[in-house]
């Protein structure tokens, strides 16, 4: 299955979860926090404005992004869990 986001939506692959804490303690599944950064894998065409024009997207495929802890909705694509979110949910592009 292939997904193309519509309008200002972005499909993000979450970064790998940390299995060790900063102090070196191995974390179990329930203790691990889901990362709030990832890589953009697909973007929509942009947000439709009231005047009918389309505002271009600031993010592009391949960008590493930072987003809120509860941003987006999980979607399953080819046995992989990805996040679908609006561009407004993205706080910044990493580096």
UniProtKB/Swiss-Prot annotation:
* Subunit-structure text: Heptamer of 7 subunits arranged in a ring. Interacts with the chaperonin GroEL.
Chaperone keyword on record: yes
- Keywords from the named record: Chaperone, Cytoplasm
Chain's role: Together with the chaperonin GroEL, plays an essential role in assisting protein folding. The GroEL-GroES system forms a nano-cage that allows encapsulation of the non-native substrate proteins and provides a physical environment optimized to promote and accelerate protein folding. GroES binds to the apical surface of the GroEL ring, thereby capping the opening of the GroEL channel.
Q: What is its main location?
A: cytoplasm
Q: Which GO terms describe its biological process?
A: chaperone cofactor-dependent protein refolding
**Single annotated GO MF:** protein folding chaperone
- Cite the CDD domains for this sequence: cpn10
Q: Which gene encodes it?
A: groES
Check the record and name the SMART domains matching this protein.
Answer: Cpn10 (SM00883)
By sequence similarity, the record places it as follows:
Belongs to the GroES chaperonin family.
Q: Which organism is it from?
A: Francisella philomiragia subsp. philomiragia (strain ATCC 25017 / CCUG 19701 / FSC 153 / O#319-036)
Its localization reads:
Cytoplasm
State the superkingdom: Bacteria
The family database entries (HAMAP family) matched by this protein are listed as: CH10
Instruction: Report what the protein is called.
Output: Co-chaperonin GroES
Q: What is the lineage of its organism?
A: Bacteria, Pseudomonadati, Pseudomonadota, Gammaproteobacteria, Thiotrichales
User: A cellular component term (GO) from this record?
Assistant: cytoplasm
């Amino acid at each position: 299955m292939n997904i193309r986001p519509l309008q200002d939506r972005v499909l993000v692959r979450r970064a790998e979860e940390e299995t060790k804490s900063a102090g070196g303690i191995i974390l179990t599944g329930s203790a691990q926090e889901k990362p709030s950064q990832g890589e953009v894998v697909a973007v929509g065409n942009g947000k439709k404005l009231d005047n009918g024009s389309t505002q271009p997207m600031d993010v592009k495929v391949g960008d590493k992004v930072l987003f809120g802890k509860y941003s987006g909705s999980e979607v399953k694509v080819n046995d992989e869990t990805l996040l679908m979110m609006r561009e407004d949910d993205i706080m910044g592009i990493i580096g």
